[in-house]
């Protein structure tokens, strides 16, 4: 499985020279395929020290919305180990991807067998200029840094799921195994998001 870090590091294959005439021919062929290869590869740019913004108007979440979000996804309590921020320019579209590795301490709802999970969140803007210094993210991501603890609601990336990035079908699993939905805090046995409070037992036992 190719991950985004391999996309950053991917280099074209060397070509073998077969004599003077063959070498010239190989150089021409090699140049053609290198161009094709570079055109096909994603122009992944790792963004250091991004300035986070929320550019999409998020509807105000109600208590039932929060409960449905948690009940219908995998919910874990864990600690952020690593964060990366990627920008991909493709034609008139720009993708902003946040990837996080979270060490799972407790599975509150659903199944997550691995000790760590790789989460991805993506924002795509087409024909809408975003200032170079800005990096759009979903709510709850901006203050995630290594060491941040929280309750994460995620959904597993389905096998074969792809994003169309610049006309290229790109496997979502190149960036993560789970899609970010929301991050909450844990306070006195309850899940808290803004001013909404849900007893953790209400999420654990819903539908049972």
Labelled PLM ranges:
Residues 2-53, 93, 128-208:
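Netrin-like (NTR/C345C) domain of secreted extracellular proteins
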Residues 86, 108-110, 156-160:
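Short loop/turn segments at secondary-structure transitions that flank enzyme active sites
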Residues 37-71, 76:
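N-terminal, intrinsically disordered, polar/charged segments of Gram-positive cell-envelope systems
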Residues 73-75, 116, 149-151:
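Intrinsic-disorder/low-complexity, polar/charged segments enriched in Ser/Thr/Lys/Arg/Asp/Glu/Gln
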Residues 71-108:
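Structural detector for short beta-strands of small beta-barrel domains
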Residues 98-133, 140-148:
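Mid-length scaffold segments of soluble, non-membrane domains
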Residues 58-65, 82-88, 127-141:
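N-terminal post-signal-peptidase region of extra-cytosolic proteins
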Residues 92, 116-120, 167:
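"Short basic amphipathic alpha-helical interaction patches in structured regions
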């Amino acid at each position: 499985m190719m991950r985004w870090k391999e996309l950053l590091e991917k280099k074209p294959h060397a070509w073998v020279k077969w004599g003077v005439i063959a070498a010239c021919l190989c150089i021409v062929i090699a140049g053609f395929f290198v161009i094709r290869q570079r055109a096909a590869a994603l122009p992944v740019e790792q963004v250091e020290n991004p300035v986070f913004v929320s550019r999409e108007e998020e509807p105000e979440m109600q208590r039932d919305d929060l409960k449905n979000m948690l009940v219908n996804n995998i919910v874990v309590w864990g600690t952020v180990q690593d964060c990366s921020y990627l920008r991909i320019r493709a034609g008139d579209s720009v993708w902003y991807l946040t990837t996080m590795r979270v060490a799972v301490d407790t599975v509150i709802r659903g199944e997550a067998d691995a000790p760590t999970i790789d989460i991805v969140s993506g924002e795509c803007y087409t024909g809408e200029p975003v200032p170079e210094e800005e990096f759009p993210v979903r709510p709850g991501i901006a203050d995630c840094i290594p060491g941040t603890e929280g309750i994460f609601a995620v959904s597993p990336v389905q096998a074969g799921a792809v994003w169309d990035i610049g006309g290229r079908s790109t496997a979502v699993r190149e960036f993560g195994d789970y899609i970010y939905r929301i991050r909450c805090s844990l306070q006195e046995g309850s899940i808290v998001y803004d001013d909404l409070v849900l007893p953790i037992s209400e999420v654990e036992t819903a539908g049972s």
